[in-house]
Each structure stands twice: as structure tokens, then as C-alpha cells.
Amino acid sequence: IGTSPSVGVLVMPAIYQAVKQHAPQLLIRNVPVTDPETQLAQFQTDLIIDGNSFTARALGHNVLYTDTLALVCRQAHPALSAPLTPENLRHYEHATFMSEGQGQDPLRQRIDELFPDRPISFSSYNMFTLAALIGSSDLLCIMPVRLFTLLQKCWPLESIPLSQLTTESIEISLHYNKLSLRDPVLENVINVIRQTF
């Protein structure tokens, strides 16, 4: 099952428990996602759980859950003592999460429209690196709420309540090669994962 580290930490514990209950003989491997469409099309991995959408017709997907977004800063950040408007928040540098091999996605475009002139001074493919940096600087970052809830247990992070983000969300989906459904074991695993979420 391919995931990024930040998605894996949120979904793999529940998947492991559910799969072990239904198919205890299976070895579950969590592998990195490098080129999701190729990995699935060439059967390099059976499943990928990701927030991206793919266009290949040979691939199927099921939405596992939808997560809202939060604007995150360190505790006692100076922005928390000023009116929380996009204009005031543009004065602070932002960090951004980037997925490998991902082009311009609609969610990123909407965030860019919300903060059109935000200065981005750091980007990383690793949410844990971003959280550590945000917790020790004045950077701001937009991230999924479930991930923020987990990361704030490790770093001194706080969510900035911003009404403009309340309608934005990200879908985390299970992706697979449709031909994989011919394998009854894999089809069962896919069904177990769907039911878990």
C-alpha cells in the first residue's frame, strides 16, 4: 500500500487492524509513492492512498474520507494578536507542502486565489519537516485538520481560525488498478479498507 508519510500515519493503523482481522495471513507493506499512476499501471504497488486524483482510465478509486483545512502557526505567533484577515496574514511568510510528481491541482489553485501574494519561503514534501519548522518560526502553513491534530501533539502548533478556509477540503482516496479486482484477495482487501473508513 503506497502512501506519503503524512497520509500513512493517519490511515495505516486502522488499515492494519482491519486487514489483520479479515485476512491475518497477509503481509502488509507500506511503500513510498513516487509516480502513482505508473506504480499502479505497472503493478509496482497494489494500492495507493493519496489526496491526488489521476486521469488514467485503467485506475479506479474510492474516497475514504474528506478532511477540512487549517491555517497553522506556532503557539504565541504574532498573527494571533492581530485581526485575522487574509490581508494581515499576507505579511507573514508561508511554507507549503508539495507532492512529488503532482501538477497544479484545483485545491492548490483555490488556496493561491485566497492568498494570491503570499510569500512562500519554504516548501517540503514532508509534513513532519513543515511542522517542526512552523513550530520554531513565524511561518504559516495550510494543512489538513486531521494531520494538524496529530502534529500539534509533537510541536507547539496552533490553528488560526480563518473563515475563508472553512469551505475548503481535501479528499483522501484509495486508488487501484481496475485489473486488480480480478484477484479475489486484493478485491477483499479493497473492500475491507473501504468499510474501515
Describe these PLM feature segments:
Residues 56-98:
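Flexible hinge/capping segments at coil-to-helix
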Residues 57-62, 67, 128-178:
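Beta-alpha-beta core module
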Residues 1-2, 48, 72, 95, ...:
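Short, well-ordered beta-strand segments
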Residues 1-55:
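Central regulatory/effector-binding core of bacterial HTH transcription factors
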Residues 21-29, 112-122:
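A local structural motif
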Residues 11, 86, 158-197:
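A late-sequence structural motif
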Residues 10, 79, 84-86, 93-115, ...:
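Secondary-structure junction motif
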Residues 34-45, 87, 127-138:
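Short helices/loops that flank or line small-molecule/ion binding pockets
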